């Protein structure tokens, strides 16, 4: 529905003015004004600027998390805080809280003020000492998890810089996990980059075809690829049923958080559940998200 102004160009490509264009949803309704529209989504949104029921009307049917677990369609999601294991300063904790509140007020839109806080927080979260602590803790924690149930894990970082540096730190401790070969190695970074990002980040750049290859490896429980580090990639629409652990070191909430944690709730053999490991203090955001998407109140 959103209208936006774009450049109006002539046949030669010269800009001759501005024009307003609308989204596909508005054109559909203009073309079929008497049609009934039904929306299907796993994560409806109810913010002031984006509201699923406001567009499609009241819910016809709700199949929530609690029902899915009861039916055996998904496994339970468990939470573990590892905040005490890593060093996030008082300033960092304050920034997380302020950013959280800012995003609440602005319905998850990023103003300049919110971006400034994000940049400040990224510097604290991505400090050399903290990355070393997280790398060491993830290795120990994941190996312990693997000894109980062999599966896959995903690490969510708040920036590409942190993702790249976390990878380097992990393979410093576990050099045998590294491989330059896309088809080998225990851990990979999944992201895109541009030439301006510098060599440390751009060496992790993947094409669409390469990401498809990595996805197949991650979905194969027999493949040696066990851990991936992402910023935004694979947090929606990616299914690897054997994935049992999600390490979160990025401010997340609402439908974005709900979509992310669903990476570990797939049924696989005798997998007892999916585990969310929190390094940033998102417990209240997780509880709110689970409450919103579950009639059982997030239990």
Predicted features and spans:
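SF2 helicase catalytic motif II
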Residues: 1-39
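Conserved nucleotide-binding/hydrolysis micro-motifs of P-loop NTPases
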Residues: 1-2, 42-47, 83-87, 160-162, ...
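Short glycine-/polar-rich loops that comprise or flank the Walker A/P-loop
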Residues: 32-36, 60, 71-77, 150-151, ...
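Short regulatory helix/loop adjacent to the ATP-binding pocket of P-loop NTPases
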Residues: 46-58, 268-272, 291
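Interdomain helical connector at the RecA1-RecA2 junction of SF1/SF2 helicase-like NTPases
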Residues: 49-150, 167-171
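Conserved segment of the helicase C-terminal RecA-like domain
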Residues: 80, 224, 257-296
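Conserved C-terminal RecA-like helicase domain
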Residues: 117-230
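A short beta-strand element within the Helicase C-terminal
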Residues: 226-230, 234-259, 274-278
